[in-house]
């Protein structure tokens, strides 16, 4: 045991110090600036080494990585290609990518703080632009299909919906439901009135909507397929562009389907877009969808579905958005969705109790 402990301690000591090659790299003044920026942004107590993994060692999630990249680009004066940045994992890889890009483009990002710099540039991906500008005729076709979905769900899934009167007369806004199953999207869309439906758009994972028939169908109802992990910047810029055009975005803040049906941790994408574009977020609570089509099941089964639309959450009127702004707005959104979801479950439980009596 003592020998194992000694080996672990020795291994830790070695891992806490840079190698000779890394020490040479760290001696560069630009690298020192970059490492200082990374150290300030990291929430981890671990030392920032060239080999440190941005996610596993330093705790940067996908959103925080984008913010870090912007800070480094502003500090070093280079703008790395988003596709290159999405493929780096360590401190050294990230810093080298930005240093190598310095001078290869007309100039660094505008001197704006954080997400302002990211969202100041519109996406140039033709797939994004095509999806956002699909025809109104196609939208009407999907709207009629949604009426059939709503009727089918009311008859066979005993769908019950409340709070639709809280939806605004017009956009732009963000609609944020919790995510339980593949039924969520069609059912929520089927409840949107035409005045809003005609200008709705969606950001979906390219894992599902990136190719084949689903990719074709997605483009016809304004779904932008992106990889939120490796191409988060494109996803956020697509959301921002649509909102700037007066459209309204359906965005699932959990980013994936719940394992057990309960709302999980919310990502801050909706909060960032709301704060920077000054648009409200309308929370939506879904229940019963997980019972109908849980993860791992090939086909859905019959189960009572419930949807509740909530009051809008307005972004704070702050002159400068900060990490604390995003955190508070995200917590408020999750708290509102969780409260409504619990209300739906309590009502369902009370009705089952009355029926049993």
Provide a role label for each language-model segment.
Residues 1-130:
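Phosphopantetheine-dependent thiolation modules in NRPS/PKS and related acyl-activating systems
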Residues 72, 175, 251:
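Conserved S/T- and glycine-rich ATP-binding loop of Class I adenylate-forming
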Residues 1-7, 234-357:
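Non-catalytic C-terminal accessory region of glycerolipid acyltransferases
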Residues 157, 207, 229-233, 263:
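A conditional alpha-helix N-cap/helix-loop micro-motif detector
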Residues 169-230:
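Catalytic core of membrane glycerolipid acyltransferases/transacylases, capturing the structured
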């Amino acid at each position: 045991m003592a020998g194992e402990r000694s080996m672990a301690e020795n291994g830790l000591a070695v891992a806490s110090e840079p190698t000779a090659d890394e020490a040479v790299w760290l001696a560069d003044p630009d690298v020192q600036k970059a490492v200082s920026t990374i150290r300030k942004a990291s929430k981890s107590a671990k030392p920032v080494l060239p080999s440190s993994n941005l996610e596993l060692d330093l705790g940067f999630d996908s959103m925080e990585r984008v913010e870090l990249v912007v800070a480094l680009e502003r500090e070093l004066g280079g703008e790395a290609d988003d596709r290159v940045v999405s493929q780096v994992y360590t401190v050294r890889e990230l810093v080298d990518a930005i240093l190598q890009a310095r001078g290869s483009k007309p100039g660094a990002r505008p001197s704006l703080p954080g997400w302002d710099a990211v969202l100041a540039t519109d996406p140039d991906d033709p797939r994004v632009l095509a999806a956002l500008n699909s025809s109104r005729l196609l939208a009407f076709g999907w709207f009629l299909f949604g009426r059939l979905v709503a009727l089918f769900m009311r008859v066979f899934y005993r769908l019950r919906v409340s709070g639709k009167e809280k939806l605004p007369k017009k956009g732009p806004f963000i609609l944020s439901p919790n995510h339980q199953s593949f039924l969520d999207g069609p059912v929520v869309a089927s409840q949107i009135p035409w005045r809003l439906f005609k200008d709705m758009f969606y950001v979906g994972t390219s894992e599902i909507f990136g190719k084949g028939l689903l990719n074709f169908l997605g483009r016809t109802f304004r779904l932008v397929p992106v990889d939120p992990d490796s191409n988060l910047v494109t996803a956020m810029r697509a959301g921002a562009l649509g909102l700037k055009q007066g459209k309204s975005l359906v965005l699932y803040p959990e980013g994936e389907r719940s394992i057990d049906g309960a709302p999980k941790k919310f990502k801050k994408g909706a909060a960032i877009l709301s704060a920077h574009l000054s648009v409200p977020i309308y929370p939506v609570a879904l229940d019963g969808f997980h019972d109908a089509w849980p993860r791992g099941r090939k086909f859905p089964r019959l189960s009572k579905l419930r949807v509740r639309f909530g009051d809008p959450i307005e972004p704070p009127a702050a002159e400068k958005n900060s990490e604390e702004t995003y955190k508070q707005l995200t917590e408020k959104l999750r708290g509102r969705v969780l409260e409504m979801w619990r209300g739906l479950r309590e009502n369902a439980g009370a009705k089952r109790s009355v029926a049993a009596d």
